[in-house]
């Protein structure tokens, strides 16, 4: 109802602006996921298929939004939730999805490369000795013998690779292709950042 006495309500609509020239981290969390994982009988302490499903969702997001250069796993949260339901049967074919999952997202701004690296180090570097003790006492599992996926977490980045293919003339040509690999690596030390200078994060 344009130009009506009710139009004043539009003044309540505010766009939140984020600071430019900063690292914006969108953290997506499952809401009520302890109950969700119990109801769906996820393996404890780690369910590889369920984690692979999460990684696939993050990978799909990065394929859709090319501005995201790195993912460590409001339209994005919505798409993540949709992907989770869509790919459920691909990763957990023997389990019926009893109810849709719920995710929330928050954006945190980090003003420097060091701040971003410290955040990622904190996410990956929760005290391994505490994890070791917990896993051993509850599940008789040695933390140090777990696959990298469970110890390091999953990291996704945009990468350009060269791929050989045959063109319409039957000749072999090399073309660049964008991919989003799922990595399970140490991001606390400098080595990863030295290898991936294309991410633009100073060491």
Tell me the role of every PLM-derived stretch.
Residues 1-203:
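Regulatory and interdomain segments flanking nucleotide-handling catalytic cores
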């Amino acid at each position: 109802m344009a130009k009506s006495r009710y139009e004043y309500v539009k003044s309540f609509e505010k766009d939140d602006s984020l600071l430019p020239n900063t690292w914006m981290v969108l953290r997506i969390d499952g809401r009520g996921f302890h109950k969700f994982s119990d109801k769906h009988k996820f393996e404890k302490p780690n369910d590889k298929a369920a984690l692979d499903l999460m990684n696939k969702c993050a990978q799909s997001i990065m394929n859709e939004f090319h501005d995201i250069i790195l993912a460590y796993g409001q339209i994005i949260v919505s798409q993540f939730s949709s992907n989770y339901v869509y790919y459920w049967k691909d990763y957990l074919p023997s389990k019926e999805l009893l109810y849709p999952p719920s995710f929330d997202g928050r954006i945190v701004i980090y003003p420097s490369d060091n701040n971003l690296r410290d955040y990622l180090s904190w996410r990956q570097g929760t005290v391994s000795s505490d994890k070791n003790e917990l896993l051993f006492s509850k599940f008789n599992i040695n933390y140090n013998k777990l696959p990298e996926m469970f110890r390091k977490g999953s990291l996704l980045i945009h990468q350009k690779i060269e791929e050989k293919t045959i063109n319409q003339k039957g000749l072999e040509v090399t073309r660049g292709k964008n991919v989003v690999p799922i990595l399970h690596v140490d991001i606390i030390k400098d080595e990863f950042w030295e290898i991936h200078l294309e991410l633009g994060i100073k060491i």
